C-alpha cells in the first residue's frame, strides 16, 4: 500500500530495509556505469534546501536525481528564511504542493523533524548537527564493496564525536558491527546513543582513550574533522584534546594488514589525518565520496517506490 516514508535517521529504517537498500545501491551503480540507470524519478520534481555550504552533498544529490530522471530545484537560506520569515510548518505544506520530495541540509535536527512531520512528501536528511545518515549509507556501501560484507566488520572511529559518529552508533543499532570509538574523555558520544547500541544487542561497542589500543586488528580506520562547520572557535581546543588520535603511518601499521582508511571529507591534512596516509594506497576516501552518489540514488529510489 502506498505510504509516505522519510529518511531522517538510520533508525527510521529496519535492518532488512537498510541491507536491501545497500543492495539496490550496488545495482544502481552497476547499471549507471553500463549507461542503463533506471529512471525511477521520471516526471518527479525534488527540492533541496541548503543552510550549510556543500560540495559532495549538493553535487551528488543533483546528479543522482538527474540520473534517475528527475528534476531538481536547489534553494538556500537566501531564498527564504524557514522558521523566521515563514514557519517550518508553512514551508512544509507549501513545498508539498509543488514538489515530490524534499531534501535538506541544515543545522537544527529539530527543524528537519518538524519539516517531515508536516510535509506530505518524503523528506530526506542530508545532514544536521545531530546526524548524517546519507553519509553512513555511502560508508556502509563502500565497506560492503571492499570487504564483501558489512556484518561484524571491525571499524575504529577516531577523533571528535560528532554527527557522523552518531550515525555510526545508529548503524550499529541496526547491523552487527565491531565498532570502536577512540576519542578523548572530553569528546565522548551521547550516552543515550551508546545505550541504544547496548540495548539493541547486535554490535560490540568499545570506547577507548588510547588510539594505539583501539586500532589493534581493525579493518577500517575512520576519521572526520575535529571541528565541524560553525565550530571554528573550537579548533585549537580540539587540537589539544585530539592530537593523539591522528591517523598516521605509525597508527595504521598497528591495525590489520588489510585495513583501509576512510574520511567523509573535507579533510584537514596533517591534523586528523596525514597527507601520507590520505593519499596512500590504503586510503579509499575518493571511492567513499563517489558512493555518496550511488547511495543517495538508492535512498531516493526507495522513498519513491514506497510512495507508489
What does each model-found stretch correspond to?
Residues 258-259, 265-308:
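Adenosine-phosphate binding glycine-rich loop
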Residues 51-64, 145-223:
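Glycine-rich phosphate/diphosphate-binding loop of Rossmann-like nucleotide-binding domains
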Residues 198-276:
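Rossmann-like adenosine-cofactor binding region
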Residues 35, 39-144, 269:
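Phosphate/diphosphate ligand-binding glycine-rich loop within oxidoreductases
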Residues 41-46, 151-153, 258:
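Phosphate-coordination loops involved in phosphoryl transfer and adenosine-cofactor binding
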Residues 68, 98, 118-119, 175, ...:
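Short, structured coil segments at secondary-structure junctions
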Residues 1-59, 63:
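Positively charged, low-complexity intrinsically disordered leader regions
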Amino acid at each position: 500500500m502506498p505510504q509516505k516514508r522519510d529518511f531522517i535517521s538510520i533508525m527510521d529504517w529496519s535492518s532488512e530495509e537498510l541491507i536491501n537498500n545497500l543492495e539496490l545501491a550496488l545495482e544502481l551503480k552497476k547499471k549507471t556505469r553500463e549507461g542503463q540507470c533506471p529512471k525511477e524519478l521520471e516526471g518527479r520534481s525534488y527540492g533541496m534546501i541548503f543552510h550549510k555550504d556543500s560540495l559532495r552533498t549538493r553535487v551528488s544529490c543533483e546528479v543522482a536525481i538527474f540520473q534517475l530522471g528527475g528534476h531538481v530545484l536547489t534553494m538556500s537560506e537566501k531564498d527564504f528564511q524557514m522558521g523566521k520569515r515563514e514557519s517550518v510548518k508553512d514551508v512544509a505544506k507549501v513545498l508539498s504542493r509543488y514538489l515530490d520530495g524534499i531534501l535538506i541540509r541544515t543545522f537544527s535536527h529539530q527543524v528537519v523533524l518538524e519539516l517531515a512531520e508536516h510535509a506530505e512528501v518524503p523528506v530526506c536528511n542530508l545532514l544536521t548537527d545531530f546526524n548524517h545518515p546519507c553519509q553512513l549509507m555511502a560508508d556502509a556501501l563502500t565497506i560492503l564493496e571492499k570487504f564483501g560484507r558489512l556484518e561484524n566488520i571491525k571499524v575504529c572511529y577516531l577523533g571528535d564525536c560528532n554527527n557522523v559518529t552518531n550515525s555510526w552508533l545508529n548503524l550499529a543499532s541496526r547491523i552487527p558491527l565491531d565498532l570502536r570509538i577512540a576519542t578523548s574523555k572530553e569528546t565522548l558520544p551521547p550516552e543515550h546513543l551508546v545505550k541504544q547500541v547496548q540495548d539493541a544487542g547486535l554490535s560490540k561497542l568499545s570506547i577507548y582513550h588510547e588510539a594505539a589500543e583501539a586500532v589493534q586488528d581493525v579493518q577500517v580506520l575512520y576519521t572526520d574533522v575535529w571541528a565541524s562547520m560553525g565550530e571554528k572557535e573550537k579548533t585549537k581546543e580540539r587540537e589539544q584534546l585530539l592530537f593523539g588520535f591522528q591517523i598516521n603511518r605509525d597508527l595504521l601499521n598497528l591495525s590489520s594488514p588489510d585495513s583501509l582508511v576512510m574520511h567523509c571529507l573535507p579533510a584537514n591534512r596533517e591534523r586528523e589525518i596525514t597527507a601520507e596516509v590520505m593519499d596512500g594506497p590504503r586510503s579509499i576516501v575518493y571511492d567513499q565520496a563517489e558512493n555518496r552518489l550511488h547511495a543517495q540514488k538508492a535512498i531516493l529510489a526507495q522513498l519513491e517506490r514506497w510512495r507508489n
